[in-house]
Amino acid sequence: MAAKDVKFGNEARIKMLRGVNVLADAVKVTLGPKGRNVVLDKSFGAPSITKDGVSVAREIELEDKFENMGAQMVKEVASKANDAAGDGTTTATLLAQSIVNEGLKAVAAGMNPMDLKRGIDKAVISAVEELKNLSVPCSDSKAITQVGTISANADEKVGALIAEAMEKVGNDGVITVEEGTGLQNELEVVKGMQFDRGYLSPYFINKPETGVVELENPYILMADKKISNVREMLPILESVAKSGKPLLIISEDLEGEALATLVVNSTRGIVKVAAVKAPGFGDRRKAMLQDISVLTGGSVISEELAMDLEKSTLEDLGQAKRVVINKDTTTIIGGVGEKQAIQSRISQIPQEIQEATSDYDKEKLNERLAKLSGGVAGLKVSAATEVEMKEKKARVEDALHATRAAVEEGVVAGGGVALVRVAGKISNLRGHNEDQNVGIRVALRAMEAPLRQIVSNSGEEPSVVTNNVKDGKGNYGYNAATDEYGDMIDFGILDPTKVTRSALQYAASVAGLMITTECMVTDLPKEDKTSDASSSPAGGMGGMGGMM
């Protein structure tokens, strides 16, 4: 076991505080409409430029191990806030820095760290309740646009695009953020169920001008097996040919003579047919095939259920109004499945999402939910250079998370005003002793930090502006973008309640742990033992030469 370096008391806390301040100072310059950029070096390629707090925090590692522990603990605040609400990382980092700095001053002055923490916790619990009282619902398109705009660093086009996407696929619908190709941001909405599997043969294409397969009112055969023998498909092919309708086959795989027979039938016009592989792998593939069967009113032909492809009939097939297949995707539009069956299937998925342990599983389950619910919206972000593209994409993702949070818990006045108002309302709060009162004051002072930093980044005097805002009431605050005072709601400067609440709670939680830290332990740096033995052969030979 490696030897450890141990530091106690004030010595440990000073080191930890240095790390906290290095990380927080790098992150907080990005806050507000006039926040500055941070340039991040990459091991290869061009450096990236960002105004996203969590992106900056993730890049910071310090050489001194004790300082690095402080930095990593604040990084945890940013990550937790990001995971909970998708935004508010810079605010959370700033709140944590303020609480730690003020709290450690009080500890150095002889206050009891545990009582300080209790005071901070008491203030935060009251502040969260007041935030909920200040919160107003965010349901209309205008409010959603404003929240998206603020979170995307005052980019109105992004805010409008997110509001449009939410209008089209619903507040709970899946909205993806992708890299576009042009210079304009675009919104692409896919109605119906789409999955990432294209046609198995280009000979199925019946629209050569667009390079796609289009099937009108097709039957849909779903098989949870590999099909290579044409004989087991003949009965169903004959039945479909008699009906005069096209056929889509979705199976684990289709190969050999089975695929060749379908291609020949399709090119000769005997049966209008196309085949694609089933989406996903393993259990996820079975679940997605079941989703498609519910959506189209058919059955999955599965040997596990003792179903035989050779004995299947038209009643086992699903149907849809239209199917469009290109080389990469298949889209099923207007499935004829029973609404009650679809709703029942949809209601199962939220429970599975709660039980899922990995983010990847949750993401895939959310995708399934959206596809069954009837649509996926894709935001295509475009920019002139790759560096700008990455920065813009991160901002759009932040804005999307913020708008979802706003719809969930409502909004409060932005620009740091809500926390200042909350601090004013609970200013008479008292603890059980004087040390707890100091803890409460530490938390109240920290609640002014976001407003002060926004003002500082815009080049104004923080104390003057903060006092002016404190003298006002309600939503009265400072618009740093235009350098004027007024009603923040009228200015369209809104913060999601969930983002502000999460930032405050996570900051206080981690900062409280840091204030009550008394000892820090880390590995001693390993010394490079350069062996003298490596140079001995040459030295020995030289000595022998002298003797001769």
Curated annotation (Swiss-Prot):
Subcellular location: Cytoplasm
Family annotation (Gene3D superfamilies): GroEL, GroEL-like equatorial domain, TCP-1-like chaperonin intermediate domain
Biased composition (Gly residues): 539-548
Isomerase keyword on record: yes
BP term (GO), one: protein refolding
InterPro entries per the UniProt record, alphabetical: Chaperonin_Cpn60_CS (IPR018370), Cpn60/GroEL (IPR001844), Cpn60/GroEL/TCP-1 (IPR002423), GroEL-like_apical_dom_sf (IPR027409), GROEL-like_equatorial_sf (IPR027413), TCP-1-like_intermed_sf (IPR027410)
UniProt keyword annotations, A-Z: ATP-binding, Chaperone, Cytoplasm, Isomerase, Nucleotide-binding
Main localization (coarse): cytoplasm
EC id: 5.6.1.7
Binding-site residues, ATP: 30-33, 51, 87-91, 415, 479-481, 495
GO molecular function: ATP binding; ATP-dependent protein folding chaperone; isomerase activity; unfolded protein binding
Stretches for region Disordered: 525-548
PROSITE patterns, per database record: CHAPERONINS_CPN60
Any single Gene Ontology cellular-component annotation: cytoplasm
Domain of life: Bacteria
Reactions that this protein is recorded to catalyse: ATP + H2O + a folded polypeptide = ADP + phosphate + an unfolded polypeptide
HAMAP family, per the entry: CH60
Quaternary context: Forms a cylinder of 14 subunits composed of two heptameric rings stacked back-to-back. Interacts with the co-chaperonin GroES.
UniProt function note: Together with its co-chaperonin GroES, plays an essential role in assisting protein folding. The GroEL-GroES system forms a nano-cage that allows encapsulation of the non-native substrate proteins and provides a physical environment optimized to promote and accelerate protein folding.
Protein's name in the database: Chaperonin GroEL
Species name: Buchnera aphidicola subsp. Rhopalosiphum padi
